[in-house]
Amino acid sequence: MKSYKTKIFSVLCAAMALGATSCVGDLDLMPNDPNTITAGNLTPEQYEAVLAKCYSGMAVSGQYGPDGASDISGLDGGTSQYTRGIFMLNEFSTDESKWIWADEGVFDLVTNTWSKGNANIFGTYSRMYVHIAICNDFLRLVGNDEKFAEMALEARALRAMSYYNIVDMFGKGGFVTEADAPGTAPVQKSRVELYNWLETELLDIVAKMSDAQPKYGRVGKDGAEALLARLYLNAEVFTGTPAYDKCAQCCENIISRHVGTGFQGSGLVENYLWLFCGDNDVYMPGGGDTNEILWGIAYDATNTQPYGGTTFLCAAAYKSVDEGGVYMNCEDYGLNQQWGCMHATPEFSDKFAAAPEDVRWSMWVKEDKGFKKENTKFSEFTDGYAVVKFTNLLRDNKATGSMKVGEITKFPNTDLPLIRLADVYLMYAECALRGAANTAKGLQYINYVRERAGVPAYTAIDLTLDNILDERCRELYWENVRRTDLVRFGKFAKGYNWSWKAGVPEGADFPEYMNLFPIPSNVIASQPDFEQNIGY
């Protein structure tokens, strides 16, 4: 797979050489050094290089280095990286992760006290729209040229992911496509309008994409249809009308393309933790092994060095310390970079209490290494278990699932899963319990996930909504779905408390309008006809 990575990143370098940064004036944001490539005499390879910018817009912050030449202004390059921004909103605001440093705006996310002026909310909103603009530029460039139809489908899928994130986190948002001329003022669309467009767009993309595996690191039919399934799963929240039957059908379509390989023939990778290690590229689309990762972001220790992505998920969870009965060493996980600033809440840790043998938390650093479960001191890294899920280790023994230290690097080679087949199985199980799919099949599907984790299978009596929510937490933690799940189950703003929720040590409810984030005040100021979300 390393040869595939080399090719991916050589294409990305070509994109940078072409100056493919995007003209984003049609979104009235703040790009740095914007350029638009025009059609004409570009070769197919150069078109592919421009498409690479649509991909890199989700992987890195900008053109150069981990914190240099970011595509957006106002935040440092590390904080403003695409998936790190989503993590700050969808994970920091929940029970799964607490950031202990007093970074501007982050404490408000961790304690559910944010406002419309929060810089990180603005940065994440802006990052989504800069990415949308980059994809729009590419689609304008290729037009209706049939030679580049597959590339256009990929760009549309990438853009759909960003619009999905807007619908999920902000509800309403500005809307611009390649059909609008550059410089066109965005029109604000409601959550329902954006949902309807997304559904139509994704249905068309899925229908036209090939069933074949895409090239390594690219998005194909599985990824696009999984995003559609995720849209349908949350339809009742997004529109007021459930679409669990449509979600279940998408799940069945995806599963049918994967059965017969992997764990118990389910298409799942045999060893859970191998999905998040330094040579997990084999499980990516086009990776050559069991492709459980339906959509992911390719990373390489030499060529992609963001302070977001998997670097963030590794380094923030590690701290090298050996004193007073406390031990942890970042090099044990194949990395020589450690921040020690992100840990679990006790409520999150308790999700594993019923089956402590669960492999999904087997690498966490707990009491035996001097870490406490309780978040007694908010700013103390060891007051809370260290959550080790993402590593730069290498696969070793398939029978035991063991891993080994390879080359120790500052940045990981670990690719970042965006949507996995395990999520699809859990989506189907939830749809079944909500009356829109086969219950026996839903039970079988959730048990694939549980048995792979080394915990006892559920019986029919165990198949409850609460158990599905908890299983999603155990399986998908730190994969940017927790806030969305809690909102869908009615347990985000109220109905379930965790340490420091609403800024209270024991946790407290907060207003339900905060199920959505505010439209940033900077956006409202620059687009006075845009409406703010209720409550802000």
What spans do the regions from the language model cover?
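Bacterial Sec-dependent N-terminal signal peptides
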Residues: 1-32
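Long, intrinsically disordered, low-complexity segments
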Residues: 22-27, 41-44, 97-100, 128-129, ...
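Membrane-proximal, proline-rich intrinsically disordered regions
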Residues: 23-81, 251, 526-536
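Short, surface-exposed recognition loops and adjoining beta-strand edges that mediate ligand/DNA contacts
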Residues: 36-38, 64-91, 176-179, 210-226, ...
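Conserved, well-structured interaction surfaces
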Residues: 44-52, 56-62, 96-170, 186-193, ...
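Glycine-rich, aromatic-lined ligand/substrate-binding cores of catalytic
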Residues: 60, 64, 291-380, 438
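Flexible, polar/acidic helix-loop-strand segments at domain edges
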Residues: 97-116, 123, 343-420
